């Protein structure tokens, strides 16, 4: 399984932010998400923060008790959802609708990081090629099916939040992990994890997950 470190081509996991070593809870925590439901032992949340969390970022209660880590990021960029892999001893179904979860401020990325850059208009001066240089190379056009500014797909078989969301999520959205976990979305909703996690949505299937990779 290709777990690249640069550019959203992984699944879950990846770097957790500036520091790789956790030394207890941070001095301050910010609201990150609100509980929606449990799903196969994971906690499904709606983001209430304008920024995007790192994969594997620790998630806390308001009293800074750690309850788990960010597992997946799903949905279009204007309506982000994420799942939490609970810590040992934490039961996903012990929470109720609306319960809030928190994150350290150093584990967040600005949304602009995932948005497409505006096109530049006007003619650009032609660059002179270096002597002996050929016309091509192996450069691509950037990206790898990850959608415009979102997370693409990891494939797999754990299902996906989304209707037609598959193969890399929507333009500017976050995929899931392939498959048919159900789905909250419509055309570019949430990708999935394969399998059949039951359903939040319509056609669920074929959702791609995180083909944009990791942080």
UniProtKB/Swiss-Prot annotation:
Looking up Pfam families in the UniProt record yields: Gar1
Q: Where is the composition biased (Gly residues)?
A: 1-16, 131-215
Per UniProt, subcellular location reads as: Nucleus, Nucleolus
- Any one GO CC term of the record: box H/ACA snoRNP complex
Note the InterPro entries from the entry.
Answer: Gar1/Naf1_Cbf5-bd_sf, H/ACA_rnp_Gar1/Naf1, Transl_B-barrel_sf
Chief subcellular location = nucleus
Tell me which Gene Ontology terms the entry assigns under biological process. Answer: snoRNA guided rRNA pseudouridine synthesis
- Please give the residue ranges the record annotates as the region RGG-box 2: 135-213
Keywords, A to Z, come to:
Nucleus, Repeat, Ribonucleoprotein, Ribosome biogenesis, RNA-binding, rRNA processing
Where in this protein does the record put region RGG-box 1? 5-17
The subunit structure is: Component of the small nucleolar ribonucleoprotein particles containing H/ACA-type snoRNAs (H/ACA snoRNPs).
* Functional summary from the UniProt entry: Non-catalytic component of the H/ACA small nucleolar ribonucleoprotein (H/ACA snoRNP), which catalyzes pseudouridylation of rRNA and is required for ribosome biogenesis. This involves the isomerization of uridine such that the ribose is subsequently attached to C5, instead of the normal N1. Pseudouridine ('psi') residues may serve to stabilize the conformation of rRNAs. The H/ACA snoRNP complex also mediates pseudouridylation of other types of RNAs. The H/ACA snoRNP complex mediates pseudouridylation at position 93 in U2 snRNA.
Which family is annotated?
Belongs to the GAR1 family.
Question: What protein does this entry describe?
Answer: H/ACA ribonucleoprotein complex subunit GAR1
């Amino acid at each position: 399984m290709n777990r690249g470190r640069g550019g959203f081509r992984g699944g879950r996991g990846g770097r957790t932010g500036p520091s790789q070593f956790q030394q207890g809870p941070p001095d301050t925590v910010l609201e990150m998400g609100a509980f929606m439901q449990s799903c196969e032992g994971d906690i499904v949340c709606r983001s209430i923060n304008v920024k995007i969390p790192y994969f594997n970022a620790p998630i806390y209660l308001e009293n800074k008790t750690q309850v788990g880590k960010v597992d997946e990021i799903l949905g279009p960029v204007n309506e982000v959802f994420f799942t939490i892999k609970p810590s040992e001893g934490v039961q996903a179904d012990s929470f109720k609708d609306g319960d809030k979860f928190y994150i350290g401020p150093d584990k967040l990325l600005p949304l602009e990081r995932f948005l497409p850059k505006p096109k530049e208009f006007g003619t650009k001066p032609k660059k002179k090629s270096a002597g002996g240089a050929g016309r091509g190379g192996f450069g691509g056009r950037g990206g790898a099916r990850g959608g415009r500014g979102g997370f693409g797909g990891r494939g797999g078989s754990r299902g996906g939040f989304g209707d037609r969301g598959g193969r890399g999520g929507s333009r500017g959205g976050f995929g899931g992990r392939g498959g048919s976990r159900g789905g909250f979305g419509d055309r570019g909703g949430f990708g999935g994890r394969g399998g059949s996690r039951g359903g939040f949505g319509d056609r669920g299937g074929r959702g791609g997950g995180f083909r944009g990779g990791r942080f």
